């Protein structure tokens, strides 16, 4: 499965380590720029102590190659970097070479979502030595992080045993780009949706959300908050139970669910975001079943990993 960017990346040529450019200048000075080379991207150990990894990020490599050019601002910045002994780190002639340079590479990669193992190539880059070197860091930046996220998501999805998993990770992600990468990789690895609207817009990932504790705290009582949310979102009403007390939240949610039934609607689900999730989700399931509401789904969030999720079904 491959999700292609619907936006054009910017500044990709400088999204690299300094030493890629110093080596490139050295190859240029040594007459090696056209020497043919092959670079293989692989990893040495499976992440998370597991038995496999899930490849991801490869679908964005074509855009990376296409947009990997040094514009005037890039050249100006590179010219401004001082050498330790004085002067500029990069020779004007080399910078002029970069200004007019376009990558000429052949790239083979395993499909995104495929299971991969240590010490086998995930991506093979072939072409002029200088091109292989220039793109190395940016390519690894795409593939390594998304493969890590996809692998973790795959483990979580397997632990969920067919129950839907949604990406709510934006607020803890490593910046805006990190949030997009997480949403993309999670979806490729089996997550059913994301809370990240920008990821939904760019990649076409289904979006999903509930409401926050702040919603409940904005009303005089929890019951008032639940009723207001049911009125505002009757077709996709998911109530968060643990703002104050989960057990009281269960009672209030059941009250609202019955009121929704009387109005011809149905409470879609409830969410629990804290406490002993394994214990509380089971108690909640029993309470809703006993109230004649077996269709109400139970959603859990907050610090969930594959081991916590396994405990929910134990």
Region roles according to the model:
Residues 1-235, 262, 266:
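Ordered alpha/beta subdomains of enzyme catalytic regions
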Residues 214-314:
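Glycine-rich phosphate/ribose-binding loops and adjacent secondary-structure elements
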């Amino acid at each position: 499965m491959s999700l292609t960017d619907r936006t054009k990346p910017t500044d990709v040529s400088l999204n690299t380590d300094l030493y890629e450019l110093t080596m490139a200048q050295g190859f240029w000075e040594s007459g090696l720029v056209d020497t043919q080379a092959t670079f293989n991207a692989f990893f040495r150990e499976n992440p998370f102590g597991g038995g496999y990894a899930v490849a991801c990020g490869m679908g964005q490599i074509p855009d990376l190659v296409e947009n990997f050019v040094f514009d005037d601002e890039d050249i100006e910045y590179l010219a401004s970097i001082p050498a330790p002994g004085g002067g500029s780190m990069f020779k004007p002639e080399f910078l002029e070479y970069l200004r007019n340079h376009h990558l000429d590479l052949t790239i083979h990669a395993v499909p995104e979502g495929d299971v991969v193992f240590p010490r086998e190539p995930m991506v093979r880059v072939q072409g002029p030595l200088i091109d292989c070197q220039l793109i190395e860091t940016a390519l690894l930046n795409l593939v390594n992080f998304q493969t890590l996220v996809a692998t973790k998501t795959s483990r979580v999805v397997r632990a969920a045993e067919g129950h839907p998993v949604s990406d709510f990770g934006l607020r803890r992600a490593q910046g805006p780009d990190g949030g997009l990468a997480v949403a993309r990789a999670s979806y490729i690895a089996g997550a059913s949706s994301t809370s990240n609207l920008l990821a939904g817009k760019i990649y076409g990932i289904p979006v999903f959300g509930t409401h926050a504790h702040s919603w409940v705290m904005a009303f005089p009582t929890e019951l008032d908050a639940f009723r207001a949310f049911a009125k505002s979102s009757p077709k996709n009403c998911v109530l968060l139970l643990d703002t104050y007390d989960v057990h009281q939240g269960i009672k209030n949610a059941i009250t609202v669910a019955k009121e929704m039934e009387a109005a011809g609607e149905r409470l879609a689900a409830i969410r629990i975001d804290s406490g002993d999730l394994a214990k509380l989700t089971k108690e909640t399931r029993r309470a809703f079943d006993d109230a004649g509401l077996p269709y109400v789904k139970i959603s859990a969030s907050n610090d969930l990993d594959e081991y916590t999720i396994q405990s929910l079904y134990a």
